[in-house]
Amino acid sequence: MTEHARLVITAGEPAGIGPDVVLGALQSPFDAQIAVVGDVQVLEQRAIALGMDLQFSMLPPDAPPPHIPGKVSVYHIPCASPVEPGRLNVANASHVVQTLRTSVQLLKDKRFDAVVTAPVQKSVINDSGLSFTGHTEFFSEQFGCKDVVMLLVNDGLRVALATTHLPLREVPDAITRESLLSKLDIVHNDLTRLYGITQPRIAMLGLNPHAGEGGHLGREEIETITPAGEEALRRGIDVTAPIPADTAFTSKQVLDADVVLAMFHDQGLPVLKARGFGSSVNITLGLPTIRTSVDHGTALELAATGKASSESMKAAITEAIACAQNQSL
């Protein structure tokens, strides 16, 4: 890494609050070189609508100078159609995907150390004919990763997910010994790489009520989750036996852990978001780079109103800088 962490930020869905929270965050100081990938005219118009006194500059294909609050360096990717805040336009879906692809290329070219993503509208991207499940899956595919892990973080808690954006009925079949071992390996390795934790303590939740109640409420803990945990222990990974999820977040095992591994999206994230929604950060583990994101969606009804909080974006930028600095040690 250079003297300053180098961050590229994708501006997200142009009709949503992505531009709002990015511009709001960049009014704050950060010890980093920061560039935004988006439509510079959309960003300028949004700044005017929000009453922000910002200076924009177009970037050549190299890293920007150290960040100065109120100054925004932009890699310009034009929208195909005019943007109306709060109103989705399928014609601009390709613009959103192109901003992501541009960020990937900048990272692959080693011009940046990390990417921070503003929210996108998955539905309008798919309505345009482009297949898009989410940022996590997109970056995994673009970097050719066999597996990645979604991790959400706030001041008091880290929650990783064994499965991500799946219908609930598909979750049990998606959890295998091999998939859990892969997730545990990634969590163990990246908490060391990005956070400097030499022996991360992982609190692993069960899938079923009361962690299966000895097989009476489901056998996944006996047949899949416990064997995966035992193999992980043999590999030197510090992981608990399956913990009943209903009381897990009050247990000493979780309180003493560095990270919780939840079995599915809505098992672990409601607790984390209840503790710090709007200031939490989404991180993709298992990538050869660093990717962080906000913990909220596009909030179309808030676009250009001045009511969208930039706190999660500021936290995502701060987290990316810290991870980049830890990785360079």
Task: Map each language-model feature to its residues.
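FAD-binding core/adjacent interface of flavoenzyme oxidoreductases
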Residues: 140-153
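Conserved hydrophobic/aromatic beta-strand scaffold that supports enzyme active sites
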Residues: 138, 150, 159-161, 291
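Ligand-binding beta-strand-loop-alpha-helix segment within the catalytic cores
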Residues: 152-182
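Contiguous, glycine/small-aliphatic-enriched amphipathic segments in soluble metabolic enzymes
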Residues: 1-135, 174, 178-263, 267-282, ...
